[in-house]
Structure formats: C-alpha cells, structure tokens
C-alpha cells in the first residue's frame, strides 16, 4: 500500500518566483544529482511532504543523512506550522517550504512557474520538491522505469525531482527502494508538464544545515552556506 498526502497550496503573493534566481544561460543537457542511500519509506501514511523534505536534504549537492523517522517528524512539524498538530490529512508544498525555513534547513525558497525554470535548476543547481496529482498508472513504472500519468487520480503526492536528460526528468518517491530503481523513476517532459499544469507545484530551496526536527528550534544566529549558494546562483 502506497501512501500519498499532498494538498494544493493556496495562493500567496509573497512567494518568491524561481525566475528571480536565474541569471545565466547554460549548455548543460544532462544531470542527475546523487542520492546515496536507500529511498525512505512513508508506508501507508499521508506523510509524503515530510519525506520529500528529507529526500531533498539527502540529495546532493549538499547532502544530509535523514531517516524514516525524520520524514515522519518533518511531517508533524508541517502540522505545527499550520497550527494543526497531529492531523493526518497531508500537507502542502508551501507548508513544507515554510517548515524547512522555520527549522533552519534553508533560508530561501522559490516557486517555479515554467518548465524552463525547472529544467535550469535541475541541470545547474540541484533538486526540487514537487507536488502533483498521482494517477493509478503512475504506481507501476514500465520496463524502462518510466511512469505514465494514466488512469484515474489516486490523490495528491509530494516527491523529489533530481535529474534531467533530453526529453525526461528523474524523480524519487518515498515508498522505499523497491519502487522503480531505489525509489527512482523517469517521467517524460511532456507528461510532467501536463501534471504541472494541473495544479502542480515545484519549489527550490537553498539548504543551510542538517536539522533534526525532534530538537527544539534554535532561535539564535547561525552560520550558513546561503551566501556561497546565492553567489553561485547569480554569478
């Protein structure tokens, strides 16, 4: 049984557009950001948001090692962000992003609105947290480990994008290493774009440190990697 649990974010005019962080062109056409542990497993819980946050931290270029328990804890922190502790009805990508910022995982997050922004980020900067509808056909990658959004909609799901080759994007979901290849799969650019335009979301953030969500929030100052990362982004 695969758990889902992504809710659509409500509009917020304060959101940063990812386009504001793209300042240069690139000739890179292929990139797969390393994910060096077994994919985490949310089991049949609606905790995909918390697990996507954990996967985002695990994935290069600035990896932090998180566990299944971290994924569950991050989900509960999302509930705390929304003022609904203990709720088991999923979470939104914006709440995931706000929670990561509150916990000190990143200081900046921005929403992509176009495929060109998503592709640029995957090829040059790192992975993105995404939220889309998940259809019944997507539960079964084909012989080439490609998923297809066919069949009825099973629900909303948060997952990670961590790679790009011509015509395809690579994703990782939080159903353990037995789904696809270590939780990973490919989806065509065309089919991902169709999902994205059906209330899909994609968020990029700048990681700053490993965070254990079970530890009380540190209200003090911290030295982060944000400055170097922003300098790299804007050239």
Whereabouts are the PLM-identified features?
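Catalytic-core signature of thiol
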Residues: 1-235
């Amino acid at each position: 049984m695969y758990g889902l649990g992504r809710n659509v974010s409500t509009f917020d005019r304060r959101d940063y557009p990812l386009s504001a962080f793209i300042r240069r062109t690139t000739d890179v056409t292929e990139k797969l950001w390393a994910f060096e542990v077994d994919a985490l497993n949310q089991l049949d819980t609606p905790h995909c948001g918390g697990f996507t946050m954990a996967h985002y931290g695990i994935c290069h270029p600035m990896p932090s090692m998180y566990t299944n328990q971290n994924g569950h804890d991050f989900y509960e922190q999302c509930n705390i962000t929304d003022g609904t502790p203990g709720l088991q009805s999923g979470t939104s990508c914006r709440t995931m992003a706000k929670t990561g910022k509150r916990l000190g995982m990143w200081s900046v997050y921005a929403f992509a609105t176009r495929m060109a922004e998503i592709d640029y980020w995957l090829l040059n900067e790192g992975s993105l947290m995404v939220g889309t509808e998940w259809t019944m056909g997507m539960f079964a990658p084909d012989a080439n480990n490609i998923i297809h959004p066919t069949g009825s909609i099973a629900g909303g799901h948060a997952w990670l994008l961590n790679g790009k080759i011509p015509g395809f994007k690579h994703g990782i979901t939080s159903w353990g290493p037995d789904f696809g290849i270590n939780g990973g799969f490919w989806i065509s650019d065309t089919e991902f774009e169709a999902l994205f335009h059906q209330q899909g979301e994609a968020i990029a953030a700048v990681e700053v440190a490993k965070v254990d969500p079970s530890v009380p929030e540190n209200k003090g100052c911290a030295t982060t990697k944000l400055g170097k990362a922003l300098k790299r982004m804007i050239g």
